[in-house]
A protein has these predicted regions:
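Conserved AdoMet/S-adenosylmethionine-binding subsite of the radical SAM
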Residues: 117-276
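Short glycine-enriched, charge-decorated loop/helix-capping segments at active-site entrances
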Residues: 51-53, 201-207, 278-288
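Generic domain-boundary/flexible-linker signal
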Residues: 36, 45-48, 148, 239, ...
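Auxiliary Fe-S-binding modules of radical SAM enzymes
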Residues: 1-19, 234-323
Length: 323
């Protein structure tokens, strides 16, 4: 178990990403930049200190972070009106002395390195819950297949101990990374964000061609279990044409070989984390009526179901997903 991964979170007792009660590892690094992403700390592989300025005691009152930083006043710590407001990552060396010195927890480190064995020690703690609920381990991100060697070894270790494995991937990776995971993955979860390639590039930073091609190839594998998701975003992909084209793709290009299609309603989440990382939250000004939007999603779900695609609103119903 020599591979080392970079993660930004481990969640125990999750129930949304795969069947049963699960432990979910979130790996850092993603090839896309979706505007609605709720986990900006997962976009880069780099371990980053984030700033929660409201907690800062002040440069004059405290200033311990500045004293601890090897670069001092000319370093990456940026103050405004006596408060630490951001960290210049171009200057930051990643020593994390600022975080270690802060008594108010105004600096949070996003990310840590972990070996497969260390991850397995976390996973084994909940083995009894997996067995009783039909649960297991999910690896998400970021994009877990950017760290395919680590993810493959982790899943192989889980398999050896009888633990169900689920990979939640953007599929914006080469087929060789996916192929490496096939023998050790019990369930796949992937998104179809939108069908228009230029609009996909505008809102995610990349074309959807690679994703769609990988989905077609996955659908050709006998017995492969795949949950598809559409994150439904107001004013972005919630139009009738996009939903119709998505259904056409599933039925014609994937031959309907999808276990479940899940429609996930947009939630305004992660804004505080964007601020901590000095990044703009691009969905801040999105306005919509929640009740109307939910009815719209329900209508889309009924239309997908009417075309023979098993469709849920949300992720909570778990029926034949268990292996």
């Amino acid at each position: 178990m020599n591979n080392v991964g970079t993660i930004f979170n481990i969640q125990h007792f999750t129930i949304h990403d795969g069947p049963g009660i699960r432990t979910e590892l979130f790996l850092k690094g993603c090839p896309l930049q979706c505007r609605w992403c709720s986990n900006p700390e997962g976009l880069t592989r780099r371990i980053q200190p984030g700033v929660y300025r409201k907690k800062c005691l002040g440069k004059r009152t405290c200033g311990l972070c500045l004293s601890a930083c090897p670069q001092g006043e000319k370093g990456p710590l940026t103050f405004y009106r006596n408060k630490l407001i951001k960290i210049d990552y171009e200057k930051c060396t990643g020593c994390m002395a600022c975080e270690e010195s802060c008594p108010a927890e105004a600096i949070k480190v996003w990310g840590r390195r972990i070996t497969v064995e260390e991850a397995m020690q976390e996973i084994r703690r909940d083995k009894g819950y997996y067995d009783r609920s039909g649960g297991g381990v999910t690896v998400s991100g970021g994009e877990p297949l950017l760290q395919a060697d680590f993810t493959e070894e982790l899943f192989r270790s889980c398999r050896e101990e009888g633990i169900h494995t689920c990979c939640e991937s953007s599929l914006w990776v080469g087929w060789e990374e996916i192929e490496k995971m096939l023998p050790v993955t019990d369930l796949w979860i992937a998104d179809i964000k939108m069908m228009d390639p230029e609009k996909h590039r505008e809102y995610t930073g990349g074309s959807n061609a690679k994703i769609l091609e990988n989905l077609k190839r996955l659908s050709e594998i006998p017995g492969l279990r795949l949950i598809l998701r559409i994150p439904v975003i107001p004013g972005v992909n919630d139009d009738q044409e996009n939903m119709d084209r998505t259904a056409d793709f599933i039925l014609q290009e994937m031959k309907g070989r999808v276990q479940t299609l899940q429609l996930l309603s947009f939630m305004r989440m992660g804004e505080e984390k964007y601020t901590s990382l000095g990044m703009p939250y691009q969905m801040k000004d999105v306005r919509f009526r929640r009740d109307y939007f939910q009815r719209k999603i329900r209508r889309f779900a009924d239309e997908f179901s009417g075309r023979g695609i098993h469709t849920l609103v949300g992720t909570r119903e778990k029926e034949e997903e268990k292996s």
